[in-house]
């Protein structure tokens, strides 16, 4: 009855919601700190909340399927024409569009060894072979080597570059990304995932990707962005892709109608306008990131310098699954990375008081179990 390809797919395990912790552990919602899904700990712009309240009565209407207002606002924000933009229910959906639309006959896709899990899921659903870099140590060099070796064996239909990379947090320089795109064949689509780009660009200008420059220089690249992270709209599910007019037109052929809701489009439109809120969130993230790095050094954790709104801790003497379960029982949701084959855990950078509590809990765990 079902496709054989589904047997190869491990169901994606999303970050645990607060409601699940309430049900399983009987902890009051107000006593739970959720730092496992890289949501914006500062919530949503007050302007967005006000707009949603004013427009809630429109929930019965189908959305404007042209997404005219948001597409034009994004076009203005990135200084491109609206014909270069496609909007999806999260940037995940645009990844799905890419995998559905590409010609994968006798082809494969390339991705990093440790990266966003949905790349692999959507590639497998498309029935395409996957090749990964052997490690995460020298990622650009490994991508070059992997591309050169694999293209002799089988056509490469797409390459995923996550910048910054989730769940590790490292980020390629924008110039290095362009260097790689320049080197690949023109019939290979390079998918540049910038879900956390706002944080990276603030921390290091060399990491700042310019989508306009990318699509002007290259006809085989698509840049992905999202409103789920710094814009605080994870629950609204809005993402976007910026690419050549030809790529966008092909993706529209697999896009279902009304794929983003009326209220989600309205929320994203207002969120994009409130750049004061965005700037404050980015600055606060940088301040709190420094606290996490200092804490890691104090406790002897190895950490991966992060350009996102999260940090990944490695500790050879701690079993990450045991630690994450203990933290969960004490009302703290973080992301165990055992499913990636790593003895590591990822923590979203929260508000100051949340982070203080994180430090207290981890210290308490170490005192009990060391």
Swiss-Prot record:
Pfam families on file: Aminotran_1_2
EC number in record: 2.6.1.9
InterPro entries associated with the record: Aminotransferase_I/II_large (IPR004839), HisP_aminotrans (IPR005861), HistidinolP_aminotransfase (IPR050106), PyrdxlP-dep_Trfase (IPR015424), PyrdxlP-dep_Trfase_major (IPR015421), PyrdxlP-dep_Trfase_small (IPR015422)
Cofactor dependence: pyridoxal 5'-phosphate
Any one biological process term the GO annotation gives: L-histidine biosynthetic process
Top-level taxon: Bacteria
GO molecular function: histidinol-phosphate transaminase activity; pyridoxal phosphate binding
Associated pathway: Amino-acid biosynthesis; L-histidine biosynthesis; L-histidine from 5-phospho-alpha-D-ribose 1-diphosphate: step 7/9
Modified residues (N6-(pyridoxal phosphate)lysine): 229
Keyword Translocase part of the UniProt annotation: no
Catalytic activity: L-histidinol phosphate + 2-oxoglutarate = 3-(imidazol-4-yl)-2-oxopropyl phosphate + L-glutamate
Keywords, ordered alphabetically: Amino-acid biosynthesis, Aminotransferase, Histidine biosynthesis, Pyridoxal phosphate, Transferase
SUPFAM superfamilies noted in UniProt: PLP-dependent transferases
HAMAP family attached to this UniProt entry: HisC_aminotrans_2
Family the UniProt entry places it in: Belongs to the class-II pyridoxal-phosphate-dependent aminotransferase family. Histidinol-phosphate aminotransferase subfamily.
Subunit structure: Homodimer.
PANTHER family in alphabetical order: HISTIDINOL-PHOSPHATE AMINOTRANSFERASE, HISTIDINOL-PHOSPHATE AMINOTRANSFERASE 2
Full protein name: Histidinol-phosphate aminotransferase
Organism encoding this protein: Helicobacter hepaticus (strain ATCC 51449 / 3B1)
Gene: hisC
């Amino acid at each position: 009855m079902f496709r054989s390809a589904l047997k190869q797919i491990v169901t994606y395990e999303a970050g645990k919601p607060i409601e699940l912790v309430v049900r399983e552990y009987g902890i009051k919602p107000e006593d739970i700190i959720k730092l496992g899904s890289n949501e914006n700990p500062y919530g949503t712009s007050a302007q967005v909340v006000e707009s949603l309240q004013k427009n809630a009565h429109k929930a019965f209407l189908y959305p404007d399927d042209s997404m005219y207002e948001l597409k034009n606002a994004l076009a203005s924000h990135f200084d491109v024409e609206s014909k270069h933009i496609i909007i999806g229910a999260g940037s995940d959906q645009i990844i799905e569009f890419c995998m559905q639309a590409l010609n994968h006959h006798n082809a494969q896709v390339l991705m990093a060894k440790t990266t966003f899990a949905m790349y692999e899921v959507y590639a497998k659903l498309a029935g395409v072979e996957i090749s990964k870099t052997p490690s995460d140590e020298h990622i650009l060099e490994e991508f070059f080597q992997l591309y050169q070796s694999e293209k002799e064996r089988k056509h490469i239909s797409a390459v995923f570059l996550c910048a910054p990379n989730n769940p590790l947090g490292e980020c390629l320089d924008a110039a290095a990304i362009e260097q790689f795109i320049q080197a690949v064949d023109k019939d290979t689509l390079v998918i540049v995932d910038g879900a956390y780009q706002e944080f990276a660009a603030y921390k290091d200008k060399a990491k700042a990707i310019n989508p306009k420059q990318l699509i002007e220089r290259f006809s085989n690249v698509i840049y992905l962005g999202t409103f789920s992270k710094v814009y605080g709209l994870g629950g609204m599910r809005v993402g976007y892709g910026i690419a050549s007019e030809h790529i966008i037109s092909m993706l529209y052929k697999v896009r279902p109608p009304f794929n983003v809701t009326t209220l989600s489009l309205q929320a994203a439109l207002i969120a994009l306008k409130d750049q004061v809120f965005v700037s404050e969130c980015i600055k606060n993230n940088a301040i709190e990131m420094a606290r996490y790095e200092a804490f890691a050094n104090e406790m002897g954790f190895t950490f991966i310098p992060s350009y996102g709104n999260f940090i990944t801790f490695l500790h050879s003497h701690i079993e990450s699954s045991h630690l994450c379960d203990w933290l969960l029982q004490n009302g703290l949701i973080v992301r165990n990375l055992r499913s990636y084959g790593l003895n590591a855990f990822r923590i979203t950078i929260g508000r100051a008081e949340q982070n203080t509590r994180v430090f207290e809990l981890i210290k308490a765990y170490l005192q009990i179990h060391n």
